């Protein structure tokens, strides 16, 4: 005899069908909740780079913030928009400090040694993105540098969210870029249509 969810009896009129439907619904509920629980924090929050909460009022942030440490966004695209904005801020600060905009300098600021294994983070990003550690990168606002920087963002997502590189949502990265730099929308679309330029994935 099938074990039915509480409150449903197979002896009732149509009880067997009700039992089967209720069992399927319960199994689906358990499956969905397991998937939700197994998601990493960055994925649940639509915050792929795990940007911490601060006084910044991020565009696309959820009205109700239930995570005490990290920002929660409405969509993954808004999470990536914030990531692009942070990188642009880094570029501008590095310029004022006379520092080159490189993967090493970016990660040393993003994941300082006081809280992270910075060297391991850098090595992982370099391996995943195939970018040189001291290679000077173009500013995020310059669409010509999108190829390398989007690989950097994807690699950082892998580390922050525990994803395989092939599972990173590249479309959301592009959507986030367009939200961050709306004047570059058409240029990015043209860039993405260029097969020679898009081979980096």
Regions found by a protein language model. Give the residues of each.
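Cell-wall polysaccharide-cleaving catalytic domain and substrate-binding groove, primarily
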Residues: 3-201
């Amino acid at each position: 005899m099938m074990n039915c969810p509480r409150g449903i009896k197979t002896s009732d009129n149509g009880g067997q069908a009700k039992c089967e439907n209720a069992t399927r619904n319960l199994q689906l509920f358990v499956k969905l909740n397991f998937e939700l629980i197994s998601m990493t924090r960055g994925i649940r929050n639509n915050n792929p780079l795990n940007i911490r909460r601060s006084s910044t009022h991020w565009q696309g942030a959820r009205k109700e913030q239930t995570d005490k440490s990290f920002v929660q966004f409405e969509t993954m695209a808004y999470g990536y928009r914030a990531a692009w904005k942070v990188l642009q801020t880094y570029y501008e600060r590095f310029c004022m400090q006379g520092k080159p905009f490189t993967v090493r300098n970016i990660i040393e600021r993003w994941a300082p040694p006081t809280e992270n294994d910075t060297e391991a983070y850098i090595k992982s990003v370099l391996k995943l993105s195939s970018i040189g550690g001291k290679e000077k990168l173009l500013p995020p606002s310059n669409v010509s540098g999108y190829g390398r920087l989007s690989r950097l963002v994807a690699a950082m997502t892998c580390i922050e969210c525990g994803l395989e590189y092939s599972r990173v949502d590249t479309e959301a990265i592009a959507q986030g870029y367009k939200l961050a730099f709306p004047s570059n929308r058409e240029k990015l679309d043209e860039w993405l249509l260029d097969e020679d330029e898009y081979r980096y994935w």
